[in-house]
Design a protein with these regions (language model features):
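Conserved ABC ATPase signature
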Residues: 37-41, 45
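Helical segment within the ABC ATPase nucleotide-binding domain
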Residues: 76-90
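Conserved H-loop
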Residues: 91-97
Length: 159
């Protein structure tokens, strides 16, 4: 029911809602958890359920505002890998807002660094890595160099 909510709010019939919700649940790997209450799901599973809910509407662009900030680092990496596959398989684009430099560089084709107040763009980085990105990219020397440059900009250009 939770995953069907947006479809219901958009006036879709029950049968169509159920079909779209089930397809989205399968896309994010939550089969078998359809009848579980949100409080019984792990943090990563809650993020997947949220993504499934949005996927039911098949938007061309997703806004991700700190979507994985509440999960541990390993779960975050798994969710990044899975979300990247969804980008590729489902053909949508995403605007990713994050405080994690590693996540920004891994998930993006372009990273924009913003100042605190007022929030202005102070730096822009084109990320050269091809999709699909392999998890081990996070240990690549060029990945580390770019992440370091982003970090430097976040500190106001100081080492």
């Amino acid at each position: 029911q939770n995953v069907e909510l947006l479809c219901e709010l958009h006036g879709m019939q029950k049968e169509e809602r159920r079909s779209l919700a089930q397809a989205s649940i399968e896309l994010v790997g939550l089969e078998g958890f359809e009848s579980h209450y949100p409080k019984s799901l792990s943090g990563g599973m809650k993020m997947r359920a949220s993504l499934a809910r949005t996927l039911t509407l098949k938007p061309p662009v997703f806004l991700f505002d700190e979507p994985f900030g509440a999960v541990d680092e390993i779960t975050r990496e798994h969710l990044n890998d899975e979300t990247q596959q969804l980008f590729l398989n489902e053909g949508f684009a995403g605007l990713f807002i994050t405080h994690s430099i590693t996540e920004a560089v891994f998930m993006s084709t372009k990273v924009l660094v913003m100042s605190a107040r007022p929030g202005n763009i102070v730096a822009e980085f084109d990320i050269p890595f091809e999709y699909p990105r392999k998890p081990d990219l996070r240990f690549d020397a060029e990945f580390a160099r770019i992440s370091g440059e982003v970090s430097k900009e976040l500190r106001g250009g100081h080492s």
